[in-house]
Amino acid sequence: MLYLDANVFIYAAINTEEIGEKARTLLQKIQQGEEKAATSALTFDEVFWSIKKRKPELAIETSYALLNFPNMEIIPADRKLAVFALEIIKEYNLAPRDALHAATALAAKADCIVSTDPHFDKLKELKRQLL
């Protein structure tokens, strides 16, 4: 199972270059059931605000698509994950949002995190997959 960082959805929605195409291809594979995926409920916030800053007309549509995406579990952020994220912050000095994504991916037993963010490379317990 793949854990999707917010940047996968952002690139898919607004990037017209190769990385945007790769993100759209990955999401299509998930949609068709070729891959299973998960992401945090917090991804909604990141995706909405990032897209709203660049292409406000796409923010709501993209957010609805994310929240209703087939073959993808949306994992709630809770106290247990927040405590786990604090442990990750302490050990790897990640930003809180990145640590929450890492904690969520690890708790969900994801095979890897799909992200363009190199901060995730610090974690020995979680492999990062590029788009």
Language-model segments: residues:
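Histidine- and aromatic-rich ligand-binding microenvironments
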Residues: 4-5, 39-41, 94-95, 117, ...
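Conserved glycosyltransferase catalytic-site signature
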Residues: 6, 41, 79, 98-102
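Acidic catalytic patch
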Residues: 15, 70-91
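Structured helix-beta-strand junction loops
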Residues: 32-34, 69-70, 91, 123
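Short, well-structured N-terminal submotif of metal-dependent ribonuclease cores
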Residues: 1-39, 52-61
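Acidic, PIN/NYN-like endoribonuclease modules and their adjacent C-terminal/linker elements
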Residues: 1, 73, 102-131
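Amphipathic alpha-helical segments within well-ordered protein domains
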Residues: 45-48, 86
